[in-house]
A protein has these predicted regions:
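Long hydrophobic segments that form regular secondary structure
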Residues: 1-11
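Conserved PLP cofactor-binding pocket of PLP-dependent enzymes
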Residues: 11-35
Length: 121
């Protein structure tokens, strides 16, 4: 579902929205689709090659995500529409790739992270 994908990607440092599609059987709280905010990416100065890397990260994470099988309640044994399992190896690789991209294109380049960590962490 869109909720599975958005949640798994968020765990890996990629933020997007889960959105309904026309005639979506899952409704607005689960959804079947996701929406990417490309203006945020281009505002950071990313271009075609970075978008290809983002697409690769998304593909990796979605390929490593599956619905969690419910283990209790009346739906025990059924796949959840909200909960998911994300392969830990996939998550680690995706986080590393996301970090590498954001190291090159920081969201807030004017922040002194060393100062903030020293005084507020």
């Amino acid at each position: 579902t869109g909720r599975h994908g958005a949640g798994a990607l968020y765990e890996c440092g990629v933020t997007l929205n889960f959105n309904s599609l026309p005639f979506d059987p899952n409704g607005p709280m689960i959804t079947s689709g996701m929406r990417l905010g490309t203006p945020a990416v281009t505002t950071l100065g990313m271009g075609v090659e970075e978008m290809k890397e983002i697409a690769g990260i998304i593909k990796l994470v979605l390929s490593g995500t599956k619905p969690k099988i419910l283990d209790s309640g009346k739906s025990a044994g059924q796949p959840s529409k909200r909960l998911y399992d994300l392969d830990p190896g996939v998550a680690n690789e995706a986080r590393a790739r996301t970090k590498a991209l954001l190291d090159r294109f920081p969201v807030y380049p004017e922040l002194d992270l060393a100062f903030l960590q020293k005084h507020f962490a």
